[in-house]
Amino acid sequence: MYDFFMTWLLPFLIIVGKTLLLLVVLLVLVAYLLYADRKIWAAVQLRRGPNVVGPWGLLQSFADLIKFVVKEPIIPAGANKGVFLLAPFVSATLALSTWAVIPVSEGWEVAKINVGLLYILAISSLEVYGVIMGGWASNSKYPFLGALRSAAQMVSYEVSIGFVLVTVILISGSLDLTTIVLKQGQGLGTTLGLPFNSFLDWNWLVLFPMFIIFFISALAETNRPPFDLVEAESELVAGHMVEYSSTPYMLFFLGEYVAIVLMCALTTILFLGGWLPPLDVWWLNWIPGVIWFVLKVCFVFFWFAIVKAFVPRYRYDQLMRLGWKVFLPLSLAMVVITAAFLKFTNFV
């Protein structure tokens, strides 16, 4: 009995506890990043934004959650009921499951696997199925058009994201996210002979063109402005979510924002040193790594919100041209250049 407890039951309970803790922290983080997104957009438009529910409107996201849950879900008469209700659960579940391998600090992840980057790429590629299922099952042309746009958009920019990940793998020599973070101490700062490691060692400087490509591709992959063609209000209203209401709509919305925060976390891990402090000095190392990680995720999300507020929406042909005629050749060329550079130098 003791062997069973130590070998099977205890590890299972630890994983369940980690998963529940991650879900709670992630959902609270999403709630307040959504609040920050609305506040930033309001400030740009000279409005106050959420300010009624709770002090300074801090509980607005939780009030919205209650509003969605207590509403009645309406299913269109001609919809495929089973697929219609399953689609938002697929979208939200896949978005949440990608966080299983995200290390918020060294040793702080639900599942430690040595191909974490490949796992994230595989699971995030499946998220489009929830959108397609929702658009098709609604039995309406506008959701279906939004779903088709989403599929084309995600396929177009996943190729560029894949090549960006290849360059990071070449630099770090690993698919393990923890190793990728720890390897970011061999960049330009160390080469210049600085007395301590700094943010100059991180991949954002060494792979700056790929950093920009990844950031813009992340906007397109998550349907954020200026690439929100999937739910363009002026033409498709809410895209694949037109016929949804109540909890199913909330699940689609949750999956979308969890994917956005995931891209912010990936940007932090791949290019901004993960949980490493900006300067390797004792008074910054004293701060827990998870605090640095969350601060960097919030910093990246701030730029997501700024782009949403300032950049006008692209046309669909411009979106496709940028993905296939600009980012794809550039990212492929950078893979070749990075591989050649590493082959003939001792940089890594």
UniProtKB/Swiss-Prot annotation:
GO terms of biological process kind: aerobic respiration
Places the protein is found: Cell inner membrane
GO cellular component entries: plasma membrane
UniProt KW rRNA-binding keyword: no
Record-linked InterPro entries: NADH_UbQ_OxRdtase_su1/FPO (IPR001694), NADH_UbQ_OxRdtase_su1_CS (IPR018086)
Primary subcellular site in the record, as a coarse category: membrane
Reaction catalyzed: a quinone + NADH + 5 H(+)(in) = a quinol + NAD(+) + 4 H(+)(out)
Single Gene Ontology MF annotation: quinone binding
EC number: 7.1.1.-
Keywords assigned by UniProt, alphabetized: Cell inner membrane, Cell membrane, Membrane, NAD, Quinone, Translocase, Transmembrane, Transmembrane helix, Ubiquinone
Domain of life of the source: Bacteria
Pfam families named among the record's database cross-references: NADHdh
Membrane topology: Multi-pass membrane protein
Keyword Transmembrane carried by entry: yes
Residues that span the membrane, as ranges: 10-30, 82-102, 115-135, 161-181, 199-219, 251-271, 287-307, 322-342
Family (UniProt): Belongs to the complex I subunit 1 family.
Known function: NDH-1 shuttles electrons from NADH, via FMN and iron-sulfur (Fe-S) centers, to quinones in the respiratory chain. The immediate electron acceptor for the enzyme in this species is believed to be ubiquinone. Couples the redox reaction to proton translocation (for every two electrons transferred, four hydrogen ions are translocated across the cytoplasmic membrane), and thus conserves the redox energy in a proton gradient. This subunit may bind ubiquinone.
Assembly, per entry: NDH-1 is composed of 14 different subunits. Subunits NuoA, H, J, K, L, M, N constitute the membrane sector of the complex.
PANTHER family in the cross-refs: NADH DEHYDROGENASE SUBUNIT 1, NADH-UBIQUINONE OXIDOREDUCTASE CHAIN 1
Name under which the protein is recorded: NADH-quinone oxidoreductase subunit H
Organism per entry: Bartonella tribocorum (strain CIP 105476 / IBS 506)
